[in-house]
Amino acid sequence: MRQYEVMYVLRPDLEEEKVKSNVARYSDVVTNYGGEISKLQEMGKRRLAYEINKFREGYYVLMNFKANSDAVAEAERLMKINDDVIRFMFVRDEK
């Protein structure tokens, strides 16, 4: 298993309940594939550097985890098809 970090930005107009369900969904994907979450940080609503899909703000979430590539591929697939996620990036930690 390798160490990964993902930062994703959710739409700012989501209700708190919907934000929590999205965070739980991606956390569950990692754990269901046998991964371990070392850090989950909800950074809250922040201003974007530039407009994305006509939004000037977004709800930022940072997750550090250890998992195999199947978990990353599944989480990435789910983020691509979810309209609530306006931007995401996975980074493999080389440590």
UniProtKB/Swiss-Prot annotation:
CDD domains listed in its UniProt record: bS6 (cd00473)
Keywords: Ribonucleoprotein, Ribosomal protein, RNA-binding, rRNA-binding
Keyword tRNA processing: no
Cellular component annotations (GO), alphabetically ordered: cytoplasm; ribonucleoprotein complex; ribosome
UniProt GO MF annotations: small ribosomal subunit rRNA binding; structural constituent of ribosome
InterPro entries tied to this protein: Ribosomal_bS6, Ribosomal_bS6_CS, Ribosomal_bS6_sf, Ribosomal_S6_plastid/chlpt, Transl_elong_EF1B/ribsomal_bS6
The UniProt record lists the keyword Ribonucleoprotein: yes
SUPFAM superfamilies: Ribosomal protein S6
GO BP annotations listed: translation
Lineage: superkingdom: Bacteria
Family note: Belongs to the bacterial ribosomal protein bS6 family.
UniProt-listed NCBIfam families: S6
Function field: Binds together with bS18 to 16S ribosomal RNA.
The name this protein goes by in its record: Small ribosomal subunit protein bS6
